[in-house]
Amino acid sequence: MLLAAGTRYAYRLCGRRAAAALQGRAGRSCARSVSTSWSPVGAAFNVKPQGHLWDLLGERRGLFGVPELSTPEGFQVAQEEALRKTEWLVERACSTPPGPQTVLIFDELSDCLCRVADLADFVKIGHPEQAFREAAQEACRSIGTMVEKLNTNVELYQSLQKLLDDKKLMDSLDAETRRVAELFMFDFEISGIHLDEEKRRRAVDLNVKILDLSSAFLMGTNFPIKIQKHLLPEHIQHHFARDGRHLVIDGLHAEASDDLVREAAYKIFLYPNADQLKCLEELLSSRDLLANLVGYLPFPTGPPGTIAQTPETVMQFLEKLSEKLCERTRKDFEMMQGMKTKLNPQNSELMPWDPPYYSGVIRAERYNIEPSLYCPFLSLGACMEGLNVLFNRLLGVTLYAEQPFKGEVWCIDVRKLAVVHESEGLLGYIYCDFFQRANKPQQDCHFTIRGGRLKEDGSYQLPVVVLMLNLPHASRDFPTLLTPGMMENLFHEMGHAMHSMLGRTRYQHVTGTRCPTDFAEVPSILMEYFSNDYRVVSQFAKHYQTGQPLPKAMVSRLCESKKVCAAAEMQLQVFYAALDQIYHGQHPLKKSTTDILMETQEQFYGLPYVPDTAWQLRFSHLVGYGAKYYSYLMSRAVASMVWKECFLQDPFNRAAGERYRREMLAHGGGKEPMLMIQGMLQKCPSIDDFVDALVSDLNLDFETFFMDSK
């Protein structure tokens, strides 16, 4: 998951993209601190980090090597310096004649703010010390205020407008520079800068209102429900937390084996809340008003140049996918209902609270998949070594563990990796915050700390990212052992990290993962395909004690088990995406959000709507992925096509790996996604191609079926 998504809209001017080429800093630059005893890199993750003498005696470098951030007060220093430099760059932008230099100055302005904002955005939720979190939060507010001022600075806007209005000048620019200029203009216009003063003020007010409503709605999506104990049967009360005479229902309890527990949790947790309903309605109407006001109708799915391009194309994609899934989904529901009848004959109707539980029961019964059987073969160090082997053979990239300086990391468990290309040298740094700790966010995610870009002196600003997971700690007797799901998540997040390392653009505004949302998940989902291929897994999955390799049959069964009821799960995602599109379509909405939910569920899912529930009020993705929830399905379709066309025959094919880097990773967000996809696949895929790619992934592997039936 890309947590940068929220920042991308809160700090619109703090764009996305980075720069070109790095000359020969390879071995020598990181040899100083790379420990040769940590070769292969996996060894660094299979032992607890030990303190070094320079941890105690050496100078304090500050978080991520930023000298000011050795203390929380350093955020104030960093933001003040950024704001001073911002004022100087604004003057430069306004006094420079229109040309390519205009875009470079805008990008430096974006970088100046993002280097504080992006770092603070991570620290405010990822740092274990409250003082650092609070200082980072204040820095986010300060930079956010400046961004809003810049987005409504008429003189700054006009300096960019002069460039875009000059057709001859624009035609003389390269495609990446033109796209970055257009993206900066989009950021201005979504703030209403091109409107008269009264409308511009309304646009600013609407932006503020949308931010406030988004925050309130997001909080409401997780708000627990308290009910009096006597309202639930006594024999299921122990499944819920107690608060005096009340029970606390804080989720759907989707994996509970008792049908009544799941039913009660579903009906109570999703019971309509009038305040939350009003908040959602105001959020949707405010977004529509803003889109009308600034001239982006309907509510924009993000900056221009997505894969889908239009809401009509998105709905066409979802409708065709739903049609192709229909029969498979019906069979999945029949299979789940059969299992429910077998286990609970008195109450056998399949309901919306049933699929997660019964699909798991069927999966376990059919394939005997017990995650604990896999864990001894999947030590964290082995998985990291597997990634290292894969990146080296595909892309010529090696990961080196470095010893961080005192104060550089926020927790002793954080590992620092230098990413080095065999001929281009040092590409950037990945900080691996992989282990559980108190008050750490539970979501696995990727943060951009510093985007790459080509600087004025010709050197390259190296990208820096953080990967955050929640893995168990190693014990005295064994290293950190991963379940198959944890291993797949690790590969997924490393896909984002390598996109950041190899998306080496000229402009920070479009560096690495700073690209349209419906393309951003392609590199990470593609890595999931590698993690499920035995030829890749066999390179590293060995028992941490005996060295015995993970049997091929176990990998095959695991992969096939993921296809159990997968059509029904994909159909659910289609329903969510369609609901999101309708909510952000034509306004005013013809019916209430709950009536729309009921109709959309009937059309796009297949299980009945439950009266007196309002699932949409718990749909947190309506905030960060408003009108963009389809993106995950679209990205998965592209990743599936790339896998089948380019890597299925040989997952270590270096020529295919180099083409993947050249055609897809290297451009970040500096090139339209469809052009990147076309370059990679050597064809322009249609909506039908995307749909077929997703549906074909659901087909069973008959070799595994035959093997298991013997």
Swiss-Prot record:
Positions of post-translational N6-acetyllysine modification: 124
Cofactor info, note text: Binds 1 zinc ion.
Transit peptide location: 1-33
Active site: 493
Primary localization: mitochondrion
InterPro entries: M3A_MIP, MetalloPept_cat_dom_sf, Neurolysin/TOP_dom2, Pept_M3A_M3B, Pept_M3A_M3B_dom
PROSITE patterns referenced in this protein's UniProt entry, alphabetically: ZINC_PROTEASE
Key words, A-Z: Acetylation, Calcium, Cobalt, Hydrolase, Iron, Magnesium, Manganese, Metal-binding, Metalloprotease, Mitochondrion, Protease, Transit peptide, Zinc
Alphabetical list of Gene3D superfamilies matching this protein: Collagenase (Catalytic Domain), Neurolysin, domain 3
Binding site for Zn(2+): 492, 496, 499
Record carries keyword Endoplasmic reticulum: no
Activity control summary: Activity is divalent cation-dependent. It is stimulated by manganese, magnesium or calcium ions and reversibly inhibited by zinc, cobalt and iron.
Keyword S-adenosyl-L-methionine set for record: no
Entry's Gene Ontology BP terms: peptide metabolic process; protein processing involved in protein targeting to mitochondrion
Molecular function GO terms recorded: endopeptidase activity; metal ion binding; metalloendopeptidase activity
Cell location: Mitochondrion matrix
GO annotation, cellular component aspect: mitochondrial matrix; mitochondrion
Record field: catalytic activity: Release of an N-terminal octapeptide as second stage of processing of some proteins imported into the mitochondrion
Cofactor(s) demanded: Zn(2+)
EC number: 3.4.24.59
Chain's role: Cleaves proteins, imported into the mitochondrion, to their mature size.
Family under the similarity heading: Belongs to the peptidase M3 family.
Assembly and oligomerization: Monomer.
Protein name: Mitochondrial intermediate peptidase
Species whose genome carries this gene: Rattus norvegicus (Rat)
Higher taxonomy: Eukaryota, Metazoa, Chordata, Craniata, Vertebrata
